[in-house]
């Protein structure tokens, strides 16, 4: 499927734009599942000012989606109408430590932020070492693992709205809840400030090693996967509910529930986005029938299904 090419009109309306605009660009290579259709427009801004300029001049009726490394996302096979914005590490990936504060661009990998904090002898960010996404995604979904969450360390986030205006949000402004933030969904996060706690370097490194060992032994990290598929319902572990419903190893087309960790869906090699989403919905139905609990997707799904 392809969409009408609107990039010439956008370029004409934004003569000072410095970032890259591409029409009908495949998004599959930009996601961990390696599935999905094209973006009608894929925009990679040169920096935060370029992003603000783009948003200020973008027609309000065009939907906007943001992707990082595509680690917790399904792009549907029909592609994504509107604009997909990809914040590249070269422009939004800097990470530095000053005192007990870690400043990072939102395209920085979570693991990299944990490493910089450890190098500065700052504890509290070790949990990020086990999350395979970017800081932007961590902010949007209050990412967490191994007993830590983004809300525990956030001092301030910087974001740009659809009008191209910059906002600075405190921890309270983010309205964090379990695997979510209550901020305007249209805000695009560009930078963050985290606070760590000075600690013994050996203890920090030991904790990071524990996080990595857990991932290696309990999660299918070498598969094409999107990470944790469903949120844990209050008082329950999603994987246990999936397992109890008999879904471990369940397949739909080229998609499969991981045998190693059944809250992970994997692309065994030839899956479509529809295979993966259908498998997820099948699991939800079986868990509801088995336990009465309705699992909620943690993975973000964007775009339209193939016609």
Swiss-Prot record:
Name listed for the protein in its UniProt record: UDP-N-acetylenolpyruvoylglucosamine reductase
GO MF terms held by the record: FAD binding; UDP-N-acetylmuramate dehydrogenase activity
Active site: 179, 228, 298
Biochemical pathway: Cell wall biogenesis; peptidoglycan biosynthesis
EC number: 1.3.1.98
Gene that specifies this protein: murB
Entry's localization field: Cytoplasm
Reactions catalysed, as given in the entry: UDP-N-acetyl-alpha-D-muramate + NADP(+) = UDP-N-acetyl-3-O-(1-carboxyvinyl)-alpha-D-glucosamine + NADPH + H(+)
